[in-house]
A protein has these predicted regions:
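An N-terminally biased module of ancient metal coordination in phosphate/nucleic-acid-related enzymes
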Residues: 1-80, 163-170, 181-240, 244-256, ...
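Extended substrate/RNA-proximal surfaces in nucleic-acid metabolism proteins
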Residues: 2-5, 61-212, 268-271, 275
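His/Asp/Glu-enriched, well-ordered alpha-helical/loop segment
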Residues: 216, 257-280
């Protein structure tokens, strides 16, 4: 009976979506790699927002395979979506140029938030803002939420996203998004697989047909918050278009226990299929 139960819940060995301090995660790359090892993972993809800066440090940790990745901020049908680049070459000049362009806009947006929040009576300490800029290549809204929390303007991080940041969103410059076609192209030029991250629930078969025509390689079919029905739908689309399916925790910090490494991920067979597609 135990063997039968084990067969129903095969071991998760790979997490192909996680963030470090190189973008908006709480763990340094090496600390995250150690955390993944402690979670009994064999493989971890470092997929920071719009940067590959954390990959090299993570690779210094022995005993775990690190997949070089990135999560690009992408424009599709006038909306922002996210695309994972997995098994990329972190030294690829084209990929770095795209990341650098988005990084500059992210830093500009951080300063926009600082100014807008000060204008409504919520100043953020300059030394702490400068610290974020020094540590993170690609600062994001999570950093702003942390700064608001540290300054005592909110009691918990979630308040920032629900109550505070929407008030100033219209006064903050946006990110410099890359078109999804260009994002897929640059990931391919960097030797990687282009995977749609946490696909929006409203995407239908026609939209996935468009993405197939753009040479998308796969979808993240298992992630935090996705329903079994949606996972089944994504797997159907993957079968129809010859895509791979990936899964990951989307880890940012230990404060979200449902998003820690080892909680959501891939079995050995599932990971092997993706690695084969990537030529690994």
């Amino acid at each position: 009976m135990c063997r039968q139960l084990a067969g129903l819940n095969p071991r998760i060995v790979a997490d192909l979506h996680a963030h470090t301090t190189a973008s908006d995660g709480d763990d340094t790359p090496s600390r995250l790699a150690v955390r993944a090892k402690h979670a009994k993972l064999d493989v971890l993809a470092i997929t920071d927002h719009d940067t590959v800066a954390g990959v090299a440090e993570a690779m210094t940790i022995p005993g775990i395979t690190i997949v070089a990745g990135v999560e690009l901020s992408v424009s599709f049908r006038d909306h922002e979506v996210h695309m994972l680049g997995l098994f990329v070459d972190p030294a690829n000049a084209d990929l770095r140029a795209v990341c650098d362009r988005i990084s500059v806009s992210r830093r500009r947006r951080l300063r926009g938030y600082v100014e807008a929040l000060a204008s409504i009576g919520l100043p953020l300490p300059e030394h702490r803002v400068a610290s974020v800029e020094a540590i993170s290549t690609c600062p994001g809204r999570r950093h702003v939420a942390n700064l608001l929390l540290e300054a005592g303007h909110i009691r918990q991080r979630s308040q920032a996203f629900v109550e505070v940041l929407p008030k100033v969103a219209g006064h903050v410059p946006g990110k410099d998004l890359v078109s999804i076609a260009d994002a897929i192209d640059v990931v391919h030029r960097a030797g990687g697989l282009a995977i749609l991250a946490h696909p929006p629930g409203e995407f239908d078969g026609a939209i996935y047909g468009e993405l197939a025509a753009l040479k998308l390689d796969g979808v993240e079919s298992k992630h935090n918050g996705v329903s079994l029905t949606q996972t089944d739908f994504l797997k159907e689309q993957a079968t129809r278009h010859g895509w791979v399916c990936t899964a990951g925790s989307d880890f940012h910090g230990a404060d979200s226990p449902d998003r820690v490494p080892g909680r959501i991920g891939m079995t050995s067979a599932e990971y092997a299929a993706v690695a084969r597609r990537a030529g690994r």
